[in-house]
A protein has these predicted regions:
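Short, solvent-exposed amphipathic alpha-helices that sit
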Residues: 15-26
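Mid-chain, well-packed structural core segment of small domains
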Residues: 65-107, 111
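A general structural signal for well-ordered alpha-helical segments in protein cores
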Residues: 17, 44, 48, 73-74, ...
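C-terminal binding/interaction regions
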Residues: 6-8, 12-13, 91-144
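A short beta-strand-loop structural module common to alpha/beta enzyme folds
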Residues: 30-41
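Accessory recognition modules or surfaces
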Residues: 1-5, 11-17, 43-46
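Short, structured active-site "lid" loops
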Residues: 47-69
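Short active-site oxyanion
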Residues: 4-5, 60-63, 82-84
Length: 144
Protein backbone atom coordinates (compact mmCIF):
# COMPACT_ATOMS: atom_id res chain seq x y z
CA UNK A 1 0.00 0.00 0.00
CA UNK A 2 1.27 3.45 -0.92
CA UNK A 3 1.86 5.96 1.86
CA UNK A 4 -0.65 8.83 1.60
CA UNK A 5 0.70 12.35 2.02
CA UNK A 6 -1.50 15.46 2.07
CA UNK A 7 0.00 18.50 0.35
CA UNK A 8 -1.13 22.10 -0.05
CA UNK A 9 0.29 25.40 -1.22
CA UNK A 10 -0.68 28.95 -2.00
CA UNK A 11 0.01 30.64 -5.35
CA UNK A 12 3.65 31.33 -4.44
CA UNK A 13 4.18 27.63 -3.76
CA UNK A 14 2.12 26.28 -6.66
CA UNK A 15 5.02 25.55 -9.03
CA UNK A 16 7.13 23.91 -6.31
CA UNK A 17 4.12 21.86 -5.16
CA UNK A 18 3.73 20.42 -8.65
CA UNK A 19 7.43 19.48 -8.71
CA UNK A 20 7.14 17.84 -5.27
CA UNK A 21 4.05 15.87 -6.30
CA UNK A 22 5.79 14.55 -9.41
CA UNK A 23 8.91 13.65 -7.40
CA UNK A 24 6.99 11.78 -4.71
CA UNK A 25 4.67 9.97 -7.11
CA UNK A 26 7.76 8.65 -8.91
CA UNK A 27 8.92 7.31 -5.52
CA UNK A 28 5.63 5.47 -5.03
CA UNK A 29 3.83 7.85 -2.68
CA UNK A 30 0.15 8.73 -3.06
CA UNK A 31 -0.58 12.45 -2.71
CA UNK A 32 -3.81 14.14 -1.61
CA UNK A 33 -3.53 17.53 -3.31
CA UNK A 34 -5.55 20.18 -1.48
CA UNK A 35 -4.49 22.89 -3.96
CA UNK A 36 -4.03 25.51 -5.01
CA UNK A 37 -4.32 24.62 -8.65
CA UNK A 38 -2.88 27.72 -10.37
CA UNK A 39 -0.66 30.73 -9.77
CA UNK A 40 -3.70 33.00 -9.25
CA UNK A 41 -3.42 34.90 -5.98
CA UNK A 42 -5.21 33.14 -3.11
CA UNK A 43 -5.02 32.89 0.70
CA UNK A 44 -2.62 30.36 2.27
CA UNK A 45 -4.95 29.37 5.17
CA UNK A 46 -7.39 27.90 2.64
CA UNK A 47 -4.74 25.29 1.77
CA UNK A 48 -2.91 24.93 5.08
CA UNK A 49 -5.99 24.06 7.13
CA UNK A 50 -7.06 21.02 5.06
CA UNK A 51 -3.57 19.51 5.19
CA UNK A 52 -3.32 20.13 8.94
CA UNK A 53 -6.81 18.68 9.52
CA UNK A 54 -5.92 15.49 7.69
CA UNK A 55 -2.68 15.09 9.66
CA UNK A 56 -4.53 15.91 12.89
CA UNK A 57 -7.07 13.15 12.22
CA UNK A 58 -4.57 10.44 11.19
CA UNK A 59 -1.86 9.15 13.52
CA UNK A 60 1.58 8.77 11.95
CA UNK A 61 0.65 10.80 8.86
CA UNK A 62 3.11 13.36 7.51
CA UNK A 63 2.11 16.40 5.44
CA UNK A 64 3.68 19.05 3.23
CA UNK A 65 2.72 22.72 2.99
CA UNK A 66 4.29 25.48 0.91
CA UNK A 67 3.91 29.25 0.63
CA UNK A 68 6.17 32.16 -0.29
CA UNK A 69 8.02 32.51 3.02
CA UNK A 70 6.61 29.38 4.64
CA UNK A 71 5.61 31.44 7.67
CA UNK A 72 1.91 32.03 7.08
CA UNK A 73 1.00 28.49 6.10
CA UNK A 74 3.16 27.14 8.95
CA UNK A 75 1.38 29.35 11.50
CA UNK A 76 -1.95 28.18 10.09
CA UNK A 77 -1.08 24.50 10.43
CA UNK A 78 0.20 24.91 13.98
CA UNK A 79 -3.23 26.12 15.13
CA UNK A 80 -4.39 22.49 14.89
CA UNK A 81 -4.16 20.32 18.00
CA UNK A 82 -1.55 17.61 17.62
CA UNK A 83 0.07 19.21 14.58
CA UNK A 84 3.75 20.04 14.83
CA UNK A 85 4.60 21.88 11.64
CA UNK A 86 8.25 22.83 11.08
CA UNK A 87 9.37 25.63 8.78
CA UNK A 88 12.48 24.25 7.07
CA UNK A 89 15.01 25.92 4.80
CA UNK A 90 17.99 23.58 5.25
CA UNK A 91 18.17 19.80 5.17
CA UNK A 92 19.58 19.56 8.69
CA UNK A 93 16.59 21.49 10.03
CA UNK A 94 14.20 19.06 8.32
CA UNK A 95 16.11 16.13 9.81
CA UNK A 96 16.12 17.55 13.33
CA UNK A 97 12.46 18.54 13.07
CA UNK A 98 11.62 14.84 12.71
CA UNK A 99 14.30 13.36 15.00
CA UNK A 100 13.96 15.78 17.93
CA UNK A 101 10.55 17.45 17.56
CA UNK A 102 8.43 14.69 15.99
CA UNK A 103 7.27 17.22 13.38
CA UNK A 104 4.42 15.84 11.31
CA UNK A 105 4.23 18.60 8.70
CA UNK A 106 7.06 20.25 6.80
CA UNK A 107 6.51 23.86 5.71
CA UNK A 108 8.65 25.13 2.86
CA UNK A 109 9.46 28.74 1.82
CA UNK A 110 9.12 28.53 -1.98
CA UNK A 111 10.67 31.95 -2.60
CA UNK A 112 13.82 31.20 -0.59
CA UNK A 113 14.89 27.66 -1.52
CA UNK A 114 15.82 25.86 -4.72
CA UNK A 115 13.91 22.94 -6.17
CA UNK A 116 16.84 20.67 -5.28
CA UNK A 117 16.89 21.88 -1.67
CA UNK A 118 13.14 21.34 -1.37
CA UNK A 119 13.28 17.78 -2.68
CA UNK A 120 16.24 16.90 -0.46
CA UNK A 121 14.44 18.24 2.62
CA UNK A 122 11.24 16.38 1.77
CA UNK A 123 13.07 13.11 1.17
CA UNK A 124 14.83 13.52 4.52
CA UNK A 125 11.65 14.52 6.35
CA UNK A 126 9.77 11.49 5.04
CA UNK A 127 12.55 9.01 5.81
CA UNK A 128 13.77 10.08 9.26
CA UNK A 129 12.15 8.68 12.41
CA UNK A 130 11.48 10.43 15.72
CA UNK A 131 14.16 9.49 18.26
CA UNK A 132 11.87 9.60 21.30
CA UNK A 133 13.67 9.37 24.64
CA UNK A 134 14.41 12.77 26.15
CA UNK A 135 12.82 14.38 23.09
CA UNK A 136 9.46 12.71 23.84
CA UNK A 137 9.31 14.47 27.21
CA UNK A 138 9.81 17.81 25.48
CA UNK A 139 7.30 17.12 22.72
CA UNK A 140 4.72 16.16 25.37
CA UNK A 141 5.00 19.71 26.76
CA UNK A 142 4.17 21.45 23.45
CA UNK A 143 0.35 21.17 23.42
CA UNK A 144 -1.73 23.60 25.48
Amino acid sequence: MKKLIPIGADHAGFELKQIVINHLEQKGYELKDFGCYSEDSIDYPDFGHPVASMVEENDNMLGIIICGSGNGINMTANKHQGVRSALCWKNEIAQLAREHNDANIIALPARFITEEEALEMIDTFLSVEFEGGRHQRRVNKISC
